[in-house]
């Protein structure tokens, strides 16, 4: 029996609301285990990688790196049609992220003699994590590697868990080739994150680590931020759907199941002002769950699901902004009314024909998104995650003279006499006298 919360939003208890809003938490529960693995990887390098790969992935590897021969075998084993689909998705992803590219350098003249600007510089190295385990995710390789390449990152590596036979799924390797990854390593979980953060005999240290993962991967990313930058916490997947009576119950239910089949910890929520739609979606979810190929995972995930009936569309929007979903679907008669009022969402899908899976694979937007409410403060993966910005100032003597009194006054007020003197020396002052 599938048990999901079905209630009027106004009747949801404080405990039930807290459970909904705190989904994806539990980092503290795995913190000690994660810390131990990271420490071992940092001190023991490749030997720790072998130990934990054998322990967690149940496979013993002599070499972590994927060879060119393995790449060629993977490519030869994929049908031309599937490879074309992969390239088509890659082209859309590349085009969308190219549109985000900033000017390499720009300048403005603030006042005569005062020229200010900004220089955009790509990071030197990035590590992309692509999950494995229950399924392979070549799409995540495209989503992480392509933006890094478009941004101009010099070195991009990929870590992904090995299969039981020690190989990597052929389509994942094909995606790495299509996207332009420099190297792929057969490493998963905490040990993969540690290897990219600290570097080992085999795996190079990177400046930044991006990509989604389970609670262990997310906890590892949070713990290594003192040695490598990360994109954001990206844990179990989630969708929130705002729908009214104009929505199709079968479509809404199928979108709930699409999210639920990711992981038993995935979260799917429908919030609607229509009792009729809510009841219809509930019935349809139960029917589709029984027929689904990944029925057991879906049924487990639906324990985290909810169908909430709101008093108004405004109440739906208010709950959505509080929930800050990874994916937000808007399936209402006036979607622009809702869109204009959305403050917190990782990626937004408007209308009956913009389901989350199209963004997962082929529309071109990025599917690496903040989860667990982090959409309140983080953006989904984009070009700016791979670029840093340096401010520039080019000031003439006359320009500095126009700022002189202001700088001196503020510096002296803060008790920084040498700051003030650094200005005065440019106008004849000799601090040594």
From Swiss-Prot:
Q: Which residues bind Zn(2+)?
A: 259, 262, 360, 419
Can you tell which superkingdom this protein's organism belongs to? Archaea
- Cofactor note text: Binds 1 zinc ion per subunit.
What's an example GO cellular component term for this entry?
cytoplasm
This entry's Enzyme Commission designation comes to: 1.1.1.23
State any GO BP term from the record.
L-histidine biosynthetic process
Which sites are catalytic?
326 (proton acceptor), 327 (proton acceptor)
Q: Which Gene3D superfamilies match?
A: 1.20.5.1300, Nitrogenase molybdenum iron protein domain
Q: Where does substrate bind?
A: 237, 259, 262, 327, 360, 414, 419
Coiled-coil residue windows: none
Q: Can you tell me which residues bind NAD(+)?
A: 129, 191, 214
The EC class name is oxidoreductase
Q: Name one Pfam family in it.
A: Histidinol_dh
Q: Which residues cross the membrane?
A: none
According to the UniProt entry, its GO molecular function terms are: histidinol dehydrogenase activity; NAD binding; zinc ion binding
Protein keywords? Amino-acid biosynthesis, Histidine biosynthesis, Metal-binding, NAD, Oxidoreductase, Zinc
Q: In which pathway does it act?
A: Amino-acid biosynthesis; L-histidine biosynthesis; L-histidine from 5-phospho-alpha-D-ribose 1-diphosphate: step 9/9
Instruction: Name the catalysed reactions.
Output: L-histidinol + 2 NAD(+) + H2O = L-histidine + 2 NADH + 3 H(+)
Cite the PROSITE patterns for this sequence: HISOL_DEHYDROGENASE (PS00611)
| Family note | Belongs to the histidinol dehydrogenase family.
Quote the NCBIfam families the UniProt record gives.
hisD
This chain's protein is named: Histidinol dehydrogenase
Q: Which organism is it from?
A: Methanosarcina barkeri (strain Fusaro / DSM 804)
